[in-house]
Design a protein with these regions (language model features):
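ASCE RecA-like P-loop NTPase motor cores
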Residues: 1-184
Length: 184
């Protein structure tokens, strides 16, 4: 059962959002060096490039992502290089899990970036006090994912005090993927 179903799509969208910034990439780089002693110079360079690029954007919706393509391509190359370095190492199981989590963080950003631009919303956020910019990417529609992963295997009950008996549930069904789910 899901309570407050009218908020479900927005909550899922928030969870499916990814953010990348100089700060997040520097944290990943530092942790990878500490845990696996890998060369993260390429990642550090990309982090600086991304920060410079983001500073040139206005805060808010990014309607043209073209100028970020070279930076994101360099991020993909740096991530692949780290994958290669890490796969050649003999790491303890616990360390390997931690290292993989940091690489997965980069993967999530790259996967979100790789989605069709018409299926995502991309924007820039900036903390003016610290001068930190972040690239944010979120899916526009979460209904297909909810239909497949949350409602595709078994029946579900969704409740919301904002819905009225006898009213239309169409918008809720559309936003949550209930109209796409194989089970009622």
């Amino acid at each position: 059962a899901v309570d407050e179903a009218h908020e479900l799509a927005e909550r899922v969208r928030e969870q499916a959002s990814v953010a990348v910034s100089l700060k997040s990439m520097t944290r990943i780089s530092r942790r990878l060096r500490a845990l696996a002693s890998v060369d993260t110079d390429a990642l550090d360079h990309v982090a600086a490039q991304l920060d410079t690029a983001l500073q040139s954007f206005q805060v808010g919706l990014m309607t043209d992502r073209t100028s970020l393509k070279p930076v994101m391509s360099a991020l993909d190359t740096a991530k692949r290089d780290l994958d290669t370095q890490i796969s050649a190492l003999q790491l303890e199981a616990a360390t390997k899990v931690l290292v993989r989590a940091f690489i997965d963080e980069l993967d999530q950003v790259l996967q979100a970036w790789g989605r069709d631009a018409e299926k995502s919303v991309t924007w820039v956020e900036r903390d003016e006090d610290r001068g930190l910019s972040s690239l944010m990417i979120a899916p526009l529609h979460v209904a297909p994912s909810l239909a497949d992963n949350a409602f595709g295997q078994r029946p579900a009950i969704l409740t919301s005090a904002t819905l009225s008996l006898g009213g239309s549930f169409d918008s809720l069904a559309y936003s949550t993927g209930l109209n796409m789910a194989p089970l009622p």
